[in-house]
């Protein structure tokens, strides 16, 4: 089961959140009238199906819904559940009702980072370290505007769950491949690896999300970080994340805000970005405001401010030693949502996916949620969780220690087992992905036997596809 490049590149747009066959089976219609005003103007180009490899699909995501107010019955159910919880309690072990779930796994949600991945195509060609940091900051901000309004939480991945996908970028005729795996369930830990060596970068991430109940809101705090590596320049950009806060879960309008601090830092260039995602004040103010500064050592060279779902402007600091710029305004556009082109995600069709791949694993839950059949959604979700508990019990009884399939721990850091940080050679074979392993087309890969996977994962043979 491979995901790789095709010989011709197509101009693709918009990463999906719900597989097209799930959408089609449920006649799920996402009208453009449901788009927010800023999303209406974001362009994407149609997918040329002739560029897809056998068994692949590329689909656009549903339009983000408008803000919502829960109906009386589900709200009463949520109030009943939350009334028994203490403020500050960790929600990772609390079975949340399915009507607040987004029909995709957290592993798939990580692909939001590449909705506008074409921004990075020429990153390694920029000569100025400051210009490179500006472009990385622009890309970072581009990931937030596509989000579910209201209360929409992705599925907690089960242990051993994987997600794999790719994107094709027309500008550089490059192929970007991503694999992700849930390497721990309690506490939840997700690992991701992304490779686009032709454009000169890879990215590794270890994410430890935790949720807290805060009364009329709940917060999803994202511990961990991602590291974007520029291969030819040997620069590493360490990225941290803000907090998502869902408000109005008991009374009021349901909405999600991005709040708190995040950073992008490069030790090799001594440049750091400090960002502050602002919560809307109780009276006045606006949603989705971000401000920040870019520092070279201890000197602030630039500041930026705006709305990450619309436009963010960057200004050369008056105190900066490089402010001998041209006379007049020093304001530039750092990020403009209206001018952004989305990039379409390509995955295997669900029928071609492995049993523990996110879209196939959760497909029955997703079907039910899309149809707003909470009874079936709850049944299917509980079934998956019961099966996971049984596997944990079986491993414990048989003294089997579970091992991640695609990632390994080295010096207290999780790294992708098959990472390749060598410089791209234009004469090298195409880089493709097979069963989670990124490799050159035409080269043999060592595949573990079904029995070894059964022993490691604690699953039945019928659940393993090799």
UniProtKB/Swiss-Prot annotation:
Bias kind Low complexity: ranges: 24-45
Coiled coil location: none
Name of a matching Pfam family: Oxysterol_BP
GO cellular component, one term: membrane
InterPro entries membership: OSBP_sf, Oxysterol-bd, Oxysterol-bd_CS
PROSITE patterns registered for this protein in UniProt: OSBP
Signal sequence extent: none
Family membership noted in the UniProt record: Belongs to the OSBP family.
Protein name: Oxysterol-binding protein 4
Organism listed in the record: Dictyostelium discoideum
